[in-house]
Amino acid sequence: MAINPRISEQYRYGSTLDRISNVKSIADDINETAISGRKLKKISDDPVATIRVLRNRTRITNLDQYRKSLDFGRGFLAKTEDALTSISESLIRAKELSIQQSNNIYDEPSRKAVAEELRQIINHVIILGNTTYSDKYVFGGFQTTQPPVSPDGHYLGDDGFIFVQIDEDSFRPININGRTVFDVPGGEEGKRPPLVNILENMYSSLFTWDRDKLHESMVDLDSAMNSVITATASLGARRVALEDVSERLDRGESQLHSDNNNLEGADMVKSALDLKRAENALNFTLQASSKMLTPSLLEFLK
């Protein structure tokens, strides 16, 4: 059975066109890789690598959220620590004044002048007790929207702890129990006298010159100072821990970006060589096909 010359000619043209189209497609793909600098442009390029890249991107997004929580926690801790440091300095000054006056060598005008300085210290401690960070009261526990220390010095907060998420299934507390600072352990009959009340007792004992009451207040003040020191130390340890977490998150994100660059990024030297080979292959294919194609069709394909 004879082969139809027209069919044979059509098959020859079709095969040539397919061959040129395939070579040109490869060259275009390599050229796009060289221009974009990325070797993963669609999932079919490397399904396993693409899935890994997507997982890394999700992890990076999560790390960004954890870092925001971490930054908030660090700021909250720093503001609380600054307030405690100022409270500690105020209590040290109050202790110095009470020691001076307890020697009974000062006259009444001097004692009243010292009492007025104590009044300023009391007001300052109340202000510090109502310190806020990002519109949240740092000493109130869960009660972050209302002042935890009343004008008369009573603690109005609760014993709740505020946690921030710093990683998957990992949470850290960023506040202290304000009651441990503003309701002082010990005191008469095991009660917890409010910190401000201790200072108020010192103030009134100087005005009325009640040495016994002044000495009792000094004992309570020592307990208050120890409570503030303990709270400050615990905050310092938490702050250092969060700094360590921050560094770990930075390292983790850097590794994820590096991994994605290795998976997605094209080797530019290799891409340049591949592009040159593809161009040569295309030129060779066009030259080899020119004998089988009419000049007009060949020009159209170029």
Q: What is the predicted function of each stretch?
A:
Residues 1-144, 204-302:
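Amphipathic alpha-helical polymerization modules
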